[in-house]
């Protein structure tokens, strides 16, 4: 039943507003921004400038924020070649407030009622079925899942989710031996605008314990943290000593005593020490140092009031206790670093989703906009003596440029956020918006980053298979598992939830939540609200979790984490950007799923939200922090095998293994039956597979590759079905044979049947965009001499519809003319063709032509081409058995079975053994079994469920295949049944018509065509275009270029010899080249001892070895050394033959041939 419960989460849940689960969190994130958060950010009323002790102020007020959706649908935007944007308008009022005896008088300075259609254009996210959050009445297009933005010129953009730089746990760092830092950030809650950020650092040097200071650049004083905690919390140093020492190991207690004693020495060194005076003196010194324009009282209030912005409305006493709890973690982390979440752990990070990107940019650009207005007022007052604002400043908020840069892939000057949507794989629509990555520049700058390994905190929440296998993104980008999502919350919901949780905590007896000396601090989003009696922590957490599941707080995604291990804290998280996923609940040693017997009978008629309402204690939404500090059993089967006492140790139980994969990995089959690298390679190849046509391919003038005759896979997983990847298809079923064919299909080479290609097998259509900009005078010029390049153009200068373009054909007329200053020439007007040519190697048909007339003529042409498989094209199975077409064979050349059926594809049989892809054989067996019995016992067509990762034994699948064949043909003998189950057939030689000696594995499989096409990559050519200046080959395929073989390359062949040049190229680089001395007696590589080359084996036997110098590659030497270390002797031997100069010369007969 655990598997069925997991499936319920994947399917749509209309009662909860979930229509497409994979991207639902992105839709909610963006919807929250454009419907709510944008109004909160833009609605502003604050002072710009103040004069005369705040009696005169220049105020700005922004109001009447309206967001209007576009009148047209995304398809119309594609046809017009325009972006799909919402329009945001607002009203700006700037006025002067003067405080008088009668009251406040207001004088208007300037105002602007923004009705400009280009004031703020917000790219609109297209959701499932072409819907958008502003206009939910748009019609539904079932195979369009959305998740994209349409940029200008109808370019679709998708984005990944970046990990926030700010961590929710302080960052511990060892600066040098016995010197440590503890850095943390404090960010104001979402209801406080503009958002305030403060970054603090606690430093500790064991040799200078008095300098245990907390500091922040220009925003806080540098002060001993123990004394600061005493100042804020108003407690004694002995209180702080007891609080820091409680439940700590002896080594930490020793350090705590030393720190408190050092703080006492500071107080004793000052006569009549007073903590208030001490802090005030430090504030005054900082005031003088910064040369602040504020008064000392204003400066002190600004510094201390804004200390810890996330606890802005919290009493100073709680801030002091919060600092004590931070110091506890710091001191414990010095001795037990491995038990503390490091900075690479996902426990410490929140994730930026689509809505958060736009929210951050809107906030930053609004501050820039207000800053520009303030500066303009100051400049006008300085120059002209009037308070005025230029209209240009009011009408340029700057948000359009920021949003445009975001969709160009730059978020706050960092690359990696958004990219162009690739139109060859439908699967990329899901995989890219569900990927999570680190800032690339963050990794380059920070030397201590180690995210390139699979971090333990990513377990269960991220797919371990779908990660980049090579390149700069290795370890930096991860794919969410199918059950994972990212939380979103509105500001109003945040405040209500915080209020309800605080009321619940304060419902406890006052003394039980005031254990500030030895209790467990309770924090809500890192803000300290109480300190709980240690004897009540288990009951508190258990009751809180039960109330959360029952909907007591109105939010089922609240995270509550009980941090033990001497750090002693209860952390409650309610903010956005947290990773959450469902788990099965274990309560008091019982799996709650088993306690509800009626659940299984009602499960088919329930949605996931129904289960959460009617059976609240079965499933709990758990964030990654709560999961990390909880005891989780990896499977229901393992849990049920435990004793009762062991079961009581667990809090949660996980779903089956298939739910730990991402959606791309779910498109594979049985990856746990294969070797590990096959899963990573399989995910990369599945994303390169060409999928079916999108709904409006002819309306988009954009590049794309699409499968013409797609088929729905027979062997699928539930995630593949619910995500609609299966329904939208990404391959075809072909009949394969695993055998050798005349030695042609070696390595990755495959044989493909010619008639299979002619019938449209794995046929694709390529859509390509050609765009040119032509000066208007060039476009209107007429050609004087007839050019073959213009043979496909009409009289209007544009290419004809349905014309077939070949290499060298012009797309539009572009004739440049020039007048010669020659009085003797009859015709001093010359013209020449400068048009851009069609450069592809294959012919294409013109599908659509668009023209825009401005100062230039912008021509956009869409060409279509059907492309059948040719030599060199790449294909793959869903188990990463990649193959390249080595030979296209006629049907008469291929072996056939007793029914005359020939294989569509022949694959090298040794690839199964070398790559260990057992699940490929299982897929063939299950697909063949489906063909024998495609309907279930109710007469309904049913695909075969073979999840990507599963705990089902292979014998179970064999038994399923056996039942299918027995049902369709019960009279089969045991041998015939075994052959059908294992897809073994006798094939006949097409030349002799005699059967082969052994049976061949022969059956159907789902085959994918990859986007790596030969004709798109071929660049080498003997003849072609040359540059005018140096008459060498052009660079780049688009310009008809090739690989240049110039003078330096020629000189290498002449001076060095062709054979040596090839050897040098194959050695890869100069660093790979290595001289090695080899002993001619034993064949060992000589060792270098004190600069002398010696054979260790012969020297021990007192032999005099003869060492010969050879040149080889470094990798060869490493291979020999490693083989020798494993006990395998590899001897380097020399060919024994006499030198050529010792051989007697051959006799030469000089007699004429006719005399012989």
Swiss-Prot record:
Broad class of where this protein is predominantly found: virion
Keyword Transcription attributed: yes
Classification via Gene3D superfamilies: 2.40.50.150, 3.90.1100.10, DNA-directed RNA polymerase, subunit 2, domain 6 (2.40.270.10), RNA polymerase alpha subunit dimerisation domain (3.90.1800.10)
GO BP field: DNA-templated transcription
Gene Ontology terms, MF aspect: DNA binding; DNA-directed RNA polymerase activity; metal ion binding; ribonucleoside binding
UniProt cross-references to InterPro entries, sorted A to Z: DNA-dir_RNA_pol_su2 (IPR015712), DNA-dir_RNAP_su2_dom (IPR007120), DNA-dir_RNAP_su2_hyb_sf (IPR037033), RNA_pol_132_poxvirus (IPR024390), RNA_pol_bsu_CS (IPR007121), RNA_pol_Rpb2_3 (IPR007645), RNA_pol_Rpb2_5 (IPR007647), RNA_pol_Rpb2_7 (IPR007641)
Enzyme Commission number(s): 2.7.7.6
PROSITE patterns per UniProt: RNA_POL_BETA (PS01166)
Keyword Lipid biosynthesis: no
GO cellular component: DNA-directed RNA polymerase complex; virion component
Catalyzed reaction equations: RNA(n) + a ribonucleoside 5'-triphosphate = RNA(n+1) + diphosphate
Keywords: DNA-directed RNA polymerase, Metal-binding, Nucleotidyltransferase, Transcription, Transferase, Virion
Subcellular location, record wording: Virion
Function: Part of the DNA-dependent RNA polymerase which catalyzes the transcription of viral DNA into RNA using the four ribonucleoside triphosphates as substrates. Responsible for the transcription of early, intermediate and late genes. DNA-dependent RNA polymerase associates with the early transcription factor (ETF), itself composed of D6 and A7, thereby allowing the early genes transcription. Late transcription, and probably also intermediate transcription, require newly synthesized RNA polymerase.
Family: Belongs to the RNA polymerase beta chain family.
Description of how the protein assembles with itself and partners: The DNA-dependent RNA polymerase used for intermediate and late genes expression consists of eight subunits 147 kDa, 133 kDa, 35 kDa, 30 kDa, 22 kDa, 19 kDa, 18 kDa and 7 kDa totalling more than 500 kDa in mass. The same holoenzyme, with the addition of the transcription-specificity factor RAP94, is used for early gene expression.
Name recorded for this polypeptide: DNA-directed RNA polymerase 133 kDa polypeptide
């Amino acid at each position: 039943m655990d598997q069925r419960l997991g499936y319920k989460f994947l399917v749509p849940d209309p009662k909860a507003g979930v229509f497409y689960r994979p991207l639902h969190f992105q839709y909610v994130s963006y919807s929250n921004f454009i419907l709510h958060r944008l109004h909160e950010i833009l609605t502003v009323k604050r002072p710009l400038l103040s004069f005369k002790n705040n009696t005169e102020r220049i105020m700005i007020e922004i109001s009447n924020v309206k967001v209007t959706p576009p009148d047209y649908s995304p398809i119309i935007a594609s046809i017009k070649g325009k972006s799909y944007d919402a329009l945001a308008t607002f009203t700006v009022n700037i006025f002067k407030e003067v405080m008088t005896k009668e009251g406040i008088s207001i004088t208007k300075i300037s105002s602007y009622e923004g009705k400009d259609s280009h004031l703020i254009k917000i790219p609109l996210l297209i959701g499932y079925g072409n819907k958008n959050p502003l206009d939910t009445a748009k019609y539904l297009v079932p195979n369009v899942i959305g998740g994209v933005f349409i940029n200008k010129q109808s370019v679709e953009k998708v984005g990944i989710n970046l990990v926030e730089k700010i961590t929710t746990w302080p960052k511990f760092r060892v600066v040098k031996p016995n010197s440590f830092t503890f850095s943390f950030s404090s960010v104001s809650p979402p209801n406080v605008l503009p958002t305030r950020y403060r970054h603090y650092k606690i430093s500790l040097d064991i040799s200078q314990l008095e300098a245990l200071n907390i500091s922040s650049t220009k925003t806080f004083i540098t002060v001993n943290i123990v004394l600061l905690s005493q100042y804020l919390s108003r407690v004694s140093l002995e209180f702080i000593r007891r609080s820091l020492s409680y439940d700590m190991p002896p080594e930490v207690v020793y350090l705590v005593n030393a720190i408190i004693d050092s703080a006492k020495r500071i107080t004793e060194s000052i006569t009549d020490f007073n903590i208030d005076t001490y802090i005030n003196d430090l504030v005054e010194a900082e005031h003088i140092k910064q040369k602040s324009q504020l008064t000392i009282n204003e400066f002190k209030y600004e510094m201390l009031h804004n200390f810890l912005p996330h606890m802005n409305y919290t009493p100073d006493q709680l801030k002091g206790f919060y600092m004590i709890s931070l110091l506890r973690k710091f001191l414990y982390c010095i001795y037990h670093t491995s038990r503390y979440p490091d900075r690479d752990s996902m426990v410490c990070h929140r994730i930026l989703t689509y809505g958060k990107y736009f929210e951050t940019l809107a906030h930053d650009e609004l501050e820039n906009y207000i800053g520009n207005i303030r500066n303009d007022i100051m400049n006008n007052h300085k120059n002209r003596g009037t308070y005025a604002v230029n209209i240009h400043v009011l009408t340029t908020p700057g948000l359009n440029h920021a949003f445009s840069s975001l969709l160009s892939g730059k978020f706050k000057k960092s690359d990696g956020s958004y990219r162009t949507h690739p139109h060859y794989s439908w699967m990329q629509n899901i995989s890219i918006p569900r990927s999570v990555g680190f800032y690339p520049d963050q990794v380059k700058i920070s030397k201590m980053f180690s995210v390139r390994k699979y971090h333990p905190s990513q377990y269960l929440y991220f797919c371990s298979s779908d990660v980049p296998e090579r390149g700069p993104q290795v370890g930096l980008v991860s794919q969410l598992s199918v059950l994972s999502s990212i939380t979103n919350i509105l500001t109003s919901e945040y405040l209500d939830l915080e209020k309800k949780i605080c009321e619940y905590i304060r419902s406890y007896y006052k003394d039980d939540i005031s254990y500030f000396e030895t209790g467990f601090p309770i924090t809500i989003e890192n803000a300290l609200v109480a300190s709980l009696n240690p004897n009540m922590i288990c009951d508190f957490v258990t009751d809180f979790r039960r109330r959360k599941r029952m909907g007591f707080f109105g939010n089922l995604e609240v995270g509550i984490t009980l941090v033990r291990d001497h750090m002693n804290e209860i952390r409650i998280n309610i903010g956005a950007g947290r990773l959450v996923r469902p788990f099965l609940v274990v309560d008091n040693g019982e799996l709650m799923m088993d306690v509800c017997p009626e659940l299984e009978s009602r499960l088919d008629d329930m949605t996931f939200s129904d289960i959460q309402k009617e059976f609240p204690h079965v499933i709990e939404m758990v964030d990654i922090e709560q999961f990390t500090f909880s005891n989780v059993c990896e499977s229901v089967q393992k849990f049920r095998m435990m004793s009762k006492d062991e079961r009581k140790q667990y809090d949660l139980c996980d779903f089956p293994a298939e739910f730990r994969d991402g959606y791309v990995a779910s498109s594979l089959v049985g990856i746990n039956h294969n070797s590990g690298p096959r899963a990573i390679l399989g995910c990369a190849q599945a994303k390169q597979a060409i999928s079916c046509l999108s709904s409006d391919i002819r309306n988009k003038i954009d590049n794309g590759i699409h499968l013409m005759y797609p088929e729905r896979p027979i062997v699928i997983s539930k995630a593949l079905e619910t995500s609609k990847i299966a329904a939208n298809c990404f391959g075809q079923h072909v009949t394969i044979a695993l055998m050798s064919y005349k030695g042609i299909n070696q390595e990755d080479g495959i044989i493909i049947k010619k008639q299979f290609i002619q019938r449209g097998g794995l046929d694709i259509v390529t859509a390509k965009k050609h765009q040119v900009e032509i000066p208007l005078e060039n476009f209107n010029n007429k050609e004087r001499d007839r050019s073959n390049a213009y043979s496909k153009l009409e009289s209007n200068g544009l290419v004809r519809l349905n014309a077939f373009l070949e290499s060298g054909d012009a797309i539009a007329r572009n004739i440049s003319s020039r007048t010669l200053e020659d009085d003797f020439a009859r015709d001093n007007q010359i013209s020449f063709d400068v048009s851009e040519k069609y450069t592809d190697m294959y012919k294409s048909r013109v599908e659509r032509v668009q023209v825009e007339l401005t100062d230039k003529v912008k021509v956009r042409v869409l060409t279509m081409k059907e492309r059948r498989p040719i030599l060199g094209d790449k294909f793959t199975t869903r188990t990463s058995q990649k193959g390249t077409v080595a030979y296209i064979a006629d049907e008469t050349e291929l072996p056939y079975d007793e029914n005359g059926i020939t294989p569509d594809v022949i694959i090298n049989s040794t690839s199964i053994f070398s790559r260990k892809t057992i699940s490929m054989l299982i897929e063939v067996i299950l697909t063949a079994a489906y063909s024998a019995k495609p309907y279930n016992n109710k007469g309904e067509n049913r695909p075969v469920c073979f999840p990507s990762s599963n705990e089902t034994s292979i014998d179970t699948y064999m038994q399923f295949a056996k039942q299918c064949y027995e049902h369709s043909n019960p009279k089969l003998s045991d041998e015939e049944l075994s052959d059908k189950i294992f897809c073994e057939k006798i094939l006949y030689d097409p030349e002799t018509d005699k059967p082969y000696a052994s049976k061949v594995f022969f059956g159907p499989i789902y085959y994918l065509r990859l986007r790596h096409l030969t004709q798109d990559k071929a660049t080498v050519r003997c003849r072609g275009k040359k540059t005018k200046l140096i008459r060498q080959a052009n660079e780049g395929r688009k310009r008809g270029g090739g690989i240049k073989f110039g003078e330096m390359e020629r000189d290498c062949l002449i001076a060095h010899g062709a054979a040596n040049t090839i050897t040098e190229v194959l050695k890869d680089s100069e660093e790979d080249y290595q001289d090695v001395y080899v002993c001619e007696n034993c064949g060992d590589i000589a060792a270098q001892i004190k600069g002398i080359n010696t054979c260790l084996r012969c020297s021990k036997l007192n032999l005099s070895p003869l060492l010969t110098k050879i040149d080889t590659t470094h990798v060869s030497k490493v291979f020999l050394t490693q083989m020798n270390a494993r006990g395998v002797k590899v001897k380097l031997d020399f060919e024994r033959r006499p030198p050529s100069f010792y051989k007697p010369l051959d006799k030469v007969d000089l007699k004429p041939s006719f005399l012989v």
